[in-house]
Amino acid sequence: MADIQIVKRDGRRQSYDNKKVAAVVARAAAGFELDVSPLLDAVNNYVKEGIGSQEVMNFLILTALNLTSVENPDWKNVAGRLKLFDLYKKTALARNCNHCYDRLYDYPVFLQQMWADGCYDREWQAKYSAEELAEAGTFIKPAYDLVYDYAGINLLIKRYLCE
């Protein structure tokens, strides 16, 4: 594949890396018995000079949905995971930590940011100790996110995240 430049969400240009896309697709398809080559072939044929990385992700999600069938229902789960990864990326960017996906569920750090941004009332700081807030963070199980299929994650985003 010739060197194709894509536009990242922050406006930077970068060479399209089909191995990086394949790794994302493999992570989304983990645990399912699916041949991911139709999805990878489709996206590699779709990518063109100057395309945005968000458009590439949208194409991956829609193509995974289109691959869903009676014979291959797990593609709806792959589409859901891809949508979830997109949400993680948007969340990381909104929190000014482009590559901090491992910290998205760091509840005390999240609360500090929400207090600093004025989104949450600082009254919580007086009512709960740092240890209690850290304990509350342990109740969140990121692995449960991977259970959502496309319809589930889409509903969650539209209903509860006001997208």
Task: Give a label for each model feature.
Residues 1-163:
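Extended catalytic cores of very large enzyme megasubunits
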